[in-house]
Amino acid sequence: SCMKAAPMKEVSIRGQGSLAYPGLWTQGNLETLSGPNDATRGLTSLADTFEHVIEELLDEQQVVQPSKENKDADLYSSRVMLSSQVPLEPPLLFLLEEYKNYLDAANMSMRVRRHSDPARRGELSVCDSISEWVTAAEKKTAVDMSGATVTVLEKVPVPKGQLKQYFYETKCSSKGYAKEGCRGIDKRYWNSQCRTTQSYVRALTMDNKKRVGWRFIRIDTSC
């Protein structure tokens, strides 16, 4: 979203913050989670199949969602994965949350939802963004919840060896409207800027006193 849009005249509005994601962990893919009956559902396209699976998983996910009374849950993200190799696709819970946020915002019936996907209507986002997996070796350091700079450890020890930490980061794209302002904002009357915002994820880190532990650190999560 457009993080800041200020008019050129004596008018001001508040920019909207970014959404963060609950701190849940998962492994696997749609093939391992969707079950054996998906092939017989009679859906006419791969897109409909994908949406159908996501809707089922969202229903099941309600059981393990953090309590609404836990305000800190809004700070945490599901963008971290421990793996022996670079993940080939975005985190499943990230896709679930993105799709759920769209459904909640649209507030539509199931049938209308499938036929009103913004991608199908040719809609464009206000700000262009890019998402990719980043290793701890590329991040090196990060800021924790107390504001201290900590070292992000590249490998996490497990019973059978070590796994690497990967972070799924989203930031504003250097191409397109990132430099020119937010898409859809009238430049004659408003100044706007696309900005990368951050949220917290849990990662294995080391502080300046060489103490190793799991801490919440900030990573890029939206534009």
UniProtKB/Swiss-Prot annotation:
One of its GO terms (biological process) is nerve growth factor signaling pathway. Residues 1-5 form the signal peptide. Disulfide bonds join 127-194, 172-223. Pfam families: NGF. InterPro entries: Brain-der_neurotrophic_factor, Cystine-knot_cytokine, Nerve_growth_factor-like, Nerve_growth_factor-rel, Nerve_growth_factor_CS. PROSITE patterns: NGF_1 (PS00248), NGF_2 (PS50270). Transmembrane segments: none annotated. Glycans are attached at residue 107. Belongs to the NGF-beta family. This is Neurotrophic factor BDNF precursor form.
